[in-house]
């Protein structure tokens, strides 16, 4: 996607969010159900007779709903907000609540400026509360149509949503994303696409562990539409420089690189490239931007860019981003030291037997550098020993721990403090023979104190072994 300044993002995203995405939403579960509910009729008179609503509320809703007075909300905004909030508070029947919510959503969709009817009302209570209460209802349509309305009220008015209400709402959306087989997941993602265009809401989403949730779902298999929507959310988040700098701490680049590699839909490719571009352009700390470039190289993004270059898409945004990324990643490769390469590989969590691991020169020159930034790389290695299920990753991590101990005088003590020795010993009984072998070597290195003495002993054993072979041959 072509480079878009932060000042323009608020103009771009509403268009993408409201027009193009609503065309997709028309076939979503929420919209199909909403179109069915519009065809029903509510007997408002029965609610009046049962004294569940007032005469004023009855007359207003009948004039709006049954007598076609569509301009009523604009003519009498205070009454409109008051009536709808009263109805949501005093009526309990799911079917009627569904209908009221569809009416409210239609009113807002017809004219965005109508959000001020609810946001600037003289309603005595907290206007968010009637809506937030509905998120706890059992009826799924009620929950998700309410969530859609809340997003519009929160995004289409300059006054921000209150922090406590915002925290509750974003936590609810996050939990809905994590729910297995959620038929309304497109609607949930749609709400986030709207909310995350507001900078203050982006940080609130970070505080409820939202970014890691997005990425954990993207790391699993989801359909391409949800994939697009969730990557879109990441794209919006990366317009904030601080969030762009944090993004790869959540392992975003490897996950997005996998999506790019597997993508068969052009719009998914386009949005992933746009995120990658922001991860390079938006961070104010150029060291972070450099690390992002190296991480992309490590995750084989250059190969995918080459494939896209050969395909020559008609999409100008894609080709612009391919050209930009190619240029920046190629430049980062030229400046890449062996330690940069190693550090990026460790941070990616995708260890493989690349040349640096087996290079004695590398370990002599760089073992001490594993202590930099609060022993960040060592901590990552120990974390991989504990959490990874990939035998190659485990074997390489064991080897690296052993080489660090071998080449850094206080290495044994530091690894023990970080819990690395215990993890390596645990892997002595791993199912994979290569993991067991590398774990055994690492344990031996952890146990030995005098490397010079060990080297001489190994050399002596080798000489004795060769001498024995010669004597045996003569005999």
Curated annotation (Swiss-Prot):
Family matches, as InterPro entries: ARM-like, ARM-type_fold, ATPase_V1-cplx_hsu, ATPase_V1-cplx_hsu_C, ATPase_V1-cplx_hsu_C_sf
The keyword Transport is assigned to this record: yes
SUPFAM superfamilies, sorted: ARM repeat
GO cellular component term, pick one: vacuolar proton-transporting V-type ATPase, V1 domain
Cited CDD domains: VATPase_H
UniProt xrefs under Pfam families: V-ATPase_H_C (PF11698), V-ATPase_H_N (PF03224)
Gene Ontology molecular function, alphabetical: proton-transporting ATPase activity, rotational mechanism
Keyword terms, alphabetized: Hydrogen ion transport, Ion transport, Transport
Self-association state and partner proteins as the record states: V-ATPase is a heteromultimeric enzyme made up of two complexes: the ATP-hydrolytic V1 complex and the proton translocation V0 complex. The V1 complex consists of three catalytic AB heterodimers that form a heterohexamer, three peripheral stalks each consisting of EG heterodimers, one central rotor including subunits D and F, and the regulatory subunits C and H. The proton translocation complex V0 consists of the proton transport subunit a, a ring of proteolipid subunits c9c'', rotary subunit d, subunits e and f, and the accessory subunits VhaAC45 and ATP6AP2.
Family named by the database record: Belongs to the V-ATPase H subunit family.
Purpose: Subunit of the V1 complex of vacuolar(H+)-ATPase (V-ATPase), a multisubunit enzyme composed of a peripheral complex (V1) that hydrolyzes ATP and a membrane integral complex (V0) that translocates protons. V-ATPase is responsible for acidifying and maintaining the pH of intracellular compartments and in some cell types, is targeted to the plasma membrane, where it is responsible for acidifying the extracellular environment. Subunit H is essential for V-ATPase activity, but not for the assembly of the complex.
Name of the protein in question: V-type proton ATPase subunit H
Organism: Manduca sexta
Lineage, top ranks: Eukaryota, Metazoa, Ecdysozoa, Arthropoda, Hexapoda
């Amino acid at each position: 996607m072509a480079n878009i300044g932060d000042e323009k993002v608020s103009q771009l995203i509403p268009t993408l969010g409201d027009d193009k995405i609503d065309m997709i939403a028309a076939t979503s579960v929420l919209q199909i159900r909403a179109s069915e509910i519009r065809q029903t009729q509510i007997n408002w008179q029965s609610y009046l007779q049962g004294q569940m609503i007032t005469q004023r509320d009855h007359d207003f809703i009948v004039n709006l709903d049954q007598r076609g007075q569509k301009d009523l909300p604009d003519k009498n905004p205070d009454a409109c907000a008051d009536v709808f909030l009263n109805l949501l508070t005093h009526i309990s029947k799911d079917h009627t609540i569904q209908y009221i919510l569809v009416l409210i959503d239609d009113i807002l969709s017809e004219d965005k400026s109508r959000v001020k009817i609810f946001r600037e009302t003289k309603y005595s209570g907290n206007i968010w509360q009637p809506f937030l209460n509905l998120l706890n209802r059992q009826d799924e349509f009620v929950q998700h149509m309410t969530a859609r309305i809340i997003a519009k009220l929160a995004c289409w008015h300059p006054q921000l949503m209150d922090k406590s209400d915002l925290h509750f709402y974003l936590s609810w959306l996050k939990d809905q994303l994590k729910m297995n087989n959620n038929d309304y997941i497109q609607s949930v993602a749609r709400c986030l696409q709207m909310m995350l265009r507001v900078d203050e809401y982006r940080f609130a989403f970070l505080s409820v562990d939202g970014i890691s949730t997005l990425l954990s779902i993207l790391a699993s298999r989801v359909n391409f539409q949800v994939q697009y929507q969730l990557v879109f959310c990441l794209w919006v988040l990366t317009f904030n420089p601080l969030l762009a700098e944090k993004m790869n701490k959540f392992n975003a680049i490897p996950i997005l690189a996998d999506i790019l590699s597997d993508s068969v839909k052009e719009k998914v490719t386009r949005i992933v490239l746009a995120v990658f571009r922001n991860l390079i352009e938006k961070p104010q700390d150029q060291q972070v931007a450099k690390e992002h470039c190296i991480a992309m190289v490590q995750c084989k993004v250059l190969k995918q860019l080459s494939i896209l270059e050969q395909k020559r898409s008609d999409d100008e945004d894609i080709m612009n981003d391919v050209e930009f990324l190619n240029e920046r990643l190629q430049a980062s490769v030229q400046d890449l030291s062996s330690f940069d390469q190693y550090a990026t590989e460790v941070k990616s969590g995708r260890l493989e037997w690349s040349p640096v691991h087996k290079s004695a020169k590398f370990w002599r020159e760089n073992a001490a550098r594993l202590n930099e930034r609060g022993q960040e790389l060592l901590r990552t290695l120990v974390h991989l020993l504990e959490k990874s299920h990939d035998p190659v990753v485990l074997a390489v991590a064991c080897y690296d721990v052993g080489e660090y101990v071998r080449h850094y005088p206080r290495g044994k003590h530091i690894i023990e403090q970080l819990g690395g020795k215990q993890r390596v010993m645990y892997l002595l009984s791993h199912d994979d023979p290569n993991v067991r072998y590398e774990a055994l070597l690492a344990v031996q290195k952890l146990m030995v104190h005098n490397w010079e003495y060990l080297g001489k002993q190994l050399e002596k054993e080798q000489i004795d072994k060769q001498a024995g072979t010669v004597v045996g041959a003569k005999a």
